[in-house]
Amino acid sequence: MSQFWSYRWNFQIMAANDYIIIAPNRRGLPGFGMEWLEQISGDYGGQCMKDYLSAIDDISKEPYVDTNRLGCVGASFGGFSVYWLAGHHDKRFKAFIAHDGIFNMEQQYLETEEMWFANWDYGWCILGQKQCNGTTYLCQLSPSFR
């Protein structure tokens, strides 16, 4: 769900097999300044997801795109994005492939060894907060509660 070279997600190989690849430069990717990079912190299901959906909506207008065969693939934050989009895509996609993405934000928060990162990215510490009941901040972001 972003532009980079990788052996596990090689866009050139996918394109060589007749797939149309859309890899938007969504909020949170490096190379566009710190403000752009940090716009996903505290907003995992927000503007960056709108970036993905607007890219899909734009390419879907092209006559060579079969909108009945759109898929979504990603790893890490891209994996979270795939899970999140599966619950919010308004029937845009027909298939989803997620690799090592966060499915339950509360669980990920409690199992990570990098608490500074979770506190920064989620915007606050949930320890001591009310347990997840579908209304807390992390539950609102979690694909598992959609």
For the regions a language model picked out, list residue spans one by one.
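Conserved HGGG/HGGXW glycine-rich cap/lid loop of the alpha/beta-hydrolase fold
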Residues: 1-3
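Active-site-proximal cap/loop segments of hydrolase catalytic domains
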Residues: 5-16, 23-146
